[in-house]
Amino acid sequence: MGDFVEDFVRYLKEIAAKWREEWERARLHEADVDPNRPKFYVTAAFPYPNSPMHLGHSRTYSVTDAYARFKRMRGFNVLFPMGFHYTGTPIIAMSEKVKQGLQALRSLGEVKTILEEIWKIKVERNLSIGEAIKEYLRGAGREDLMDKTDSIEYLVLFYKVFEIPVEDLEKLTEPLSMANYFASITEEGMKELGYMIDWRRKFTTVDPDFQKFITWQFLKLYDLGYVEKGTHPVAWDPVYDTPVSQHDTKGDVEPEIEEYDVILFKLKDEDLYLPAATLRAETVFGVTNVWLNPEAEYEVVEVDGKRWVLSKKAAYKIKFQKDEVKSLGPIDPKKLLKKMVINPATEEEVPVLPARFVDPNVATGVVMSVPAHAPFDYVALKELEGDPEYSDIVKSIELVQVIRVPEEGLLVPQLVEKLGIRDTSDKKKLEEATREVYSKEYRKGRMLESVLERVKGDERLRAALKAFLGNDPVPDAREKTAKWLKLFGAGDVFYEIKNAPVYSRFGNEVVVKVLKDQWFLNYGDPQWKELARKALARMRIIPENFLKEFEDTIDWLQKRACARTRGLGTPLPWDKRWIIESLSDSTIYMAFYTVVNILRGASVEPEKLQPEVWDYIMLGKGNPKELEEKYGISAAVLEEARRSFDYWYPVDSRHSGKDLIRNHLTFFIFNHAAIFPEDKWPRQIVVNGFVNLEGKKMSKSLGNIIPITVAIRSFAPDIIRLVLLHSAELGSDADFRTEMVSRAISNLREIKSIVEKVKDYNGPRPANLTMLDAWYLSSFVKDVENVTNMMEDLKIREVTNVLYFILLNRTKEYLNALEAMGRGLDEVAKWVLRYTVERWVKMMTPFTPFFAEEMWHELGFNTFVVTEPWPVKDEELVNPLAEAAKEYVEKVIEDIKEIIKVAKIEKPKKVRIEVASPEQVKMLKMAVEFVNSGKSLREFMAEATKVFGKKEAKSLRQAFERATSLSESMRSVIARGEFDEKAVLEEFKRLIEEEVGSEVEIRRYEGGKKRPEPLRPAIYVE
């Protein structure tokens, strides 16, 4: 950055520090109940303090703060609170990693020196942090510490990226100490960014009073029947023996559980089963063979008394899903090839064949082959046909069609040929074909009755199956087939992590465990789902395109484990061995913000906050006098808390990242719908995308994370806010780029210089405005209206584009035109600019609040700008004629320049402009009237030729075509007969001369060879 840029950034940081101090001294961001003002309650997802806040976190909070400031200036009493989420395993896992990392480094030498050396290797060799650590360990001859790479990586990140002093790293080895340390850094970062947060309401989820609130919530859910104990598959950390959800995993990945149907194919003449895992049980009637991967490791495992052949990974996973599991040792898959197995559905014998496309890490590692309905199977068989060892077997295999799709033949052979798939190495095309086949068959397919003839046994069985399955839609047939196979012991289930591999915060790969005696929130309860749908239907989702994802999530959500055996948080009230997990204690905490400052201000002891107390505060049930007698809490305090909750609730706008739609945000809807009356249900959810850095995803391994403290020191708070808010539309991912930082700095400097031009001006409103002044003001008051409407819809990128780019460029254009026309900043122009700047500064407040505050005071005001009313559109200043005139003049200047360029005239002496005759103007006026009333060219010509004669048919047709292409403002002034081309050009003559570098003469057409059209003057350049 150049000196002037550095000076301006220093200035921005200085004014940010100054105004932060002033705001805090004035307690500007504190919000209390005010019955005389409408309220607006806005919340954003509270952060996990398991690391310092960085740029990626700050987008959600910057959007929320901009919206909160806007609503405050629109006359609302706005509350924006913040707390910290300590619940669950993330903080414990991180503190353990730090402890392990420090132990490893201390065994090598001095911690600081080693961290510096690792960073040097990373930078010099352009490696990831993890690769640099491994290089260092190899060089030190300490390969035995390779398994501690992940732990050391966090230390490098904290020390070099987050700039945490080495002496403070020890503080991070104890969970609560770490949480408090990072929470204080995050709070400071939020204050430095100017967020309008009422910090009196801060709490953590391990605070005793909050835990009493969560206890009340869960007792309510239990009484409603939404908390159940039972058996259910859950994502599981196999080392720490605890369920995991999104907040418990590395990268905040939600483990998705997928249920496979298992179909048991018994080896002929052997007590051994090949358990084929499938998502398409209905196709079992068309199985031609079973696949094993000859390169994979397999084991024999006794499952519920039967000997299953499973991949090594599946043999490990099955132990978490079944009670009766016994490992019987490895088995060579090659020894099973060519053997025959029995299809349990048809009792047909089919061969076991090799396929390297079978992934031993997915489900059982055994796949049934249905080539008529699976592109991979079809192509693999074609491939195997060329292998002499298997050629005869494959040639004897015939495709068996199980499903028919109306007006389609067998889809698989058609698609394989269409896509030009040659072999199984063409995975992308095979996956594309698979998706298309599965989709069409699922949506349109029906079971063929004829395929059920393959079932062995008596005719009665086949008849029963035809009645049971024949002609069924695929989804029904799938479910029925799986149930039928399970009924006689030939079917089972296997659960898999669909988006594997997913790792817990402790670094262990997550598996699926079928958990018994586990506590669940039953989001599958039909009554609860209906309430959630009702609540969602009444809400506004921004951006609207995310609504379907909410609807889909409500539909597929089922039971969800709500408690853990490990982690920070609130014990389950009726079974204190369990801790309520992080996505279950973060659904209605927004209600706690509304009263926490009152209860703590009155020094209410947490033990007194029994369920009856919360019933009164949150639901208005009970008598405060009786509660005072019973629990010793002042009735006045209880009544104040009740009034506060009743005033602030419901949440008017909830803000979060789009990754939380499928869990937290939907749980937020469910829990509010269950516990609170309808008038307290949330009104709006706002979702935003993520933040990239210079086009790349921010990653701890790459070390390309910018902590907020570092960003503020480098760029200043207002610049960070503006770049984050301007770089993408709400639902898209933002990109924090140095180029955009430079533009933001440059534009704020220019805006400051504009403000300084009129900071001391306080003259009266002029009696008359020129066309130029009127154009500028008319455009501006329209901006006010557009910006206001866009902010209501949170189209923040469009708003910042208007305020910091379009309006700035238009203002510069206005100032340049003033100079060109010889006016300079005269008294009228000063008033125009002052009028604009005052309102412009107000509208910048949500986005660059420190800069706006400084500019507001530069203009001579002594109030805080956020307490000022938002600008409103001044209808008196709307001037379509001035806008049309400026539009017209710009086009004329553009045409003149083009003529000069084409004619290659270096120094034009004179430009003559001839405008259309009055009669032609009348033609255009009539054409505009017809266009405005929706009439056709034919209707226009029929009437116009009566007025102007048939000889003018060509001109009339041109006039009509011209009328259809005009802007709305131009059409309106033409229709009113207000637009005089010659007068407009005369008024802007000096500007035109300055722009084209020549003397300009303007006159009306009085005859001649080149006849000008209305708004298309004839131009002659000498």
From Swiss-Prot:
Keywords: Aminoacyl-tRNA synthetase, ATP-binding, Cytoplasm, Ligase, Nucleotide-binding, Protein biosynthesis
PANTHER family per record: LEUCINE--TRNA LIGASE, CYTOPLASMIC (PTHR45794:SF1), LEUCYL-TRNA SYNTHETASE (PTHR45794)
Organism: Ignicoccus hospitalis (strain KIN4/I / DSM 18386 / JCM 14125)
Family according to the record: Belongs to the class-I aminoacyl-tRNA synthetase family.
E.C. no: 6.1.1.4
Gene name of this polypeptide: leuS
The protein's name: Leucine--tRNA ligase
Domain of life, per lineage: Archaea
Residues that hold ATP according to the record: 700
GO BP terms, alphabetized: leucyl-tRNA aminoacylation
Keyword hit for Protein biosynthesis: yes
Enzyme class: ligase
GO molecular function annotation: aminoacyl-tRNA deacylase activity; ATP binding; leucine-tRNA ligase activity
Residue positions of motif 'HIGH' region: 47-57
UniProt short sequence motif 'KMSKS' region, positions renumbered to this chain: 697-701
GO CC entries: cytoplasm
Catalysed reaction, written as an equation: tRNA(Leu) + L-leucine + ATP = L-leucyl-tRNA(Leu) + AMP + diphosphate
Subcellular location: Cytoplasm
NCBIfam families the UniProt entry points to: leuS_arch (TIGR00395), PRK12300.1 (NF008957)
